[in-house]
């Protein structure tokens, strides 16, 4: 019996040894499998290479699958290095809260055949409580493909991949990172709610096509703060159906300014309301703070309760502009009147210099005038010497006080 007991004990110890070491090996070989609440997934331990040449798409996708499938707080680590990846799809809902820690750089493939029609580079869908943070970069490598952009020439065009797209994301945060040289828009939010964008840098050449910095549509509760944006299109663009937006401490330039719109291009667009832009600086931008609606608008909608305050212009073109006959590159299909209503807009303490004589442009339509426009302490001077500072105001109704006399439209 003793022999049997000793043999059983030996077998038990051997089995235990195998189980323990087997689990260690399994854990070492596959760090992507979460074993309980909380977890961290380093993409280099899943096969990613930081040499900037090896395709690391599979490793990043595996890290997402494991982090999204784990409970508690999960972290995907992008360590220092340059990681080449193709299109990434991060789909929820997730069982826990996921943080993507970007310490290194993700480089987008320049092979457009890898992107499906109207595809994006990094697309995040139906994920709540997402955090993307770090000091690394999301590099769209746009210079390699910008020449293939046809949207600057024709109305109906094939869109190049956006860099970071978040759809149906609630209570999300993007902080600290740099978005660089997107092929199209750098960041695009659609039907998102309660989003915080802070301490972000967005960078592309001033002549890069359609490289909007941050765009949002059909979203609410978006805050953008302490962010520097220099791009080839709008620094920030607020699309239809958006409300409760707060933009503070943003430096914009180069770029086309901070815009609401374009509005009315597509059918069934929804209203824009409760937009606040405060304590921002615009440097050598093509436009300043702008509201724009297509002159051949397909939708009837209203933009209202819009407040601009403490905005400094540094040699920006058209610092204040409401354009209800917007028609980029003269590609509109008809010379019609916009169906968009603009009302209850305040410009308060807007100062600095303009690169164009027209420091204020309120270009509304006779059929639907702009109403409730308040200009309070607007003091912008033309920086040139060949003309004088002026305002161009058509079909706009409101009040002005404390403004440079040349800019008081009312």
Swiss-Prot record:
Catalysed conversion reaction: [(1->4)-alpha-D-galacturonosyl](n) + H2O = alpha-D-galacturonate + [(1->4)-alpha-D-galacturonosyl](n-1)
Superkingdom: Eukaryota
Annotated PROSITE patterns: POLYGALACTURONASE
Keyword Isomerase: no
UniProt subcellular location: Secreted; Secreted, Cell wall
Tissue specificity comment: Pollen.
Glycosylated position list: 89, 201, 246, 349, 387
Signal peptide interval: 1-22
Protein name as annotated: Exopolygalacturonase
Biological source species: Zea mays
């Amino acid at each position: 019996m003793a022999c049997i007991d000793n043999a059983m004990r030996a077998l038990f110890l051997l089995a235990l040894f195998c189980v323990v070491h087997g689990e260690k090996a399994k854990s070492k070989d596959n760090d992507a499998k979460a074993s309980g609440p909380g977890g961290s997934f380093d993409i280099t331990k899943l096969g990613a290479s930081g040499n900037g040449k090896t395709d690391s798409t599979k490793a990043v996708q595996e890290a997402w699958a494991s982090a999204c499938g784990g409970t508690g707080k999960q972290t995907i680590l992008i360590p220092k290095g340059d990681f080449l990846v193709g299109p990434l799809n991060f789909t929820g809902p997730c069982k826990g809260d996921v943080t993507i820690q970007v310490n290194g750089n993700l480089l987008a493939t320049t092979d457009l055949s890898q992107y499906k029609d109207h595809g994006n580079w990094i697309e995040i869908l139906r994920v709540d409580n997402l955090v993307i943070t770090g000091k690394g970069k999301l590099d769209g490598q746009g210079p390699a493909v910008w020449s293939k952009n046809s949207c600057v020439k024709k109305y109906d065009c094939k869109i190049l991949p956006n860099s970071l797209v978040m759809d149906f994301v609630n209570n999300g945060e993007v902080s600290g990172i740099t978005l660089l040289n997107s092929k199209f828009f750098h960041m695009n939010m659609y039907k998102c709610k309660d989003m915080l964008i802070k301490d972000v840098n967005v960078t592309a050449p001033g002549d890069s096509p359609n490289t909007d910095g941050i765009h949002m549509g059909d979203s609410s509760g978006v805050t953008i703060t302490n962010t520097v944006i220099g791009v080839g299109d709008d620094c920030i663009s607020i699309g239809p159906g958006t409300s409760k937006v707060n933009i503070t401490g943003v430096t914009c330039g180069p770029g086309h300014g901070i815009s609401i719109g374009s509005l009315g291009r597509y059918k069934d667009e929804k209203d824009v309301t409760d937009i606040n832009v405060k304590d921002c600086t615009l440097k050598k931008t093509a436009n300043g703070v702008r509201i724009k609606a297509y002159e051949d608008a397909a939708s009837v909608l209203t933009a209202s309760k819009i407040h601009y305050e403490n905005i400094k212009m540094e040699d920006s073109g058209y610092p204040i502009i409401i354009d209800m006959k917007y028609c980029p590159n003269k590609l509109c299909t008809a010379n019609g009147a916009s169906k968009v209503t603009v009302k209850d807009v305040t410009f308060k303490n807007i100062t600095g210099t303009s690169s164009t004589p027209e420091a204020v442009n309120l270009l509304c339509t006779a059929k639907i005038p702009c109403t409730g426009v308040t200009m309070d302490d607007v003091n912008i001077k033309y920086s040139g010497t060949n003309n004088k500072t002026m305002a161009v105001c058509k079909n706009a109704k409101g009040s002005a006080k404390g403004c440079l006399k040349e800019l008081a439209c009312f």
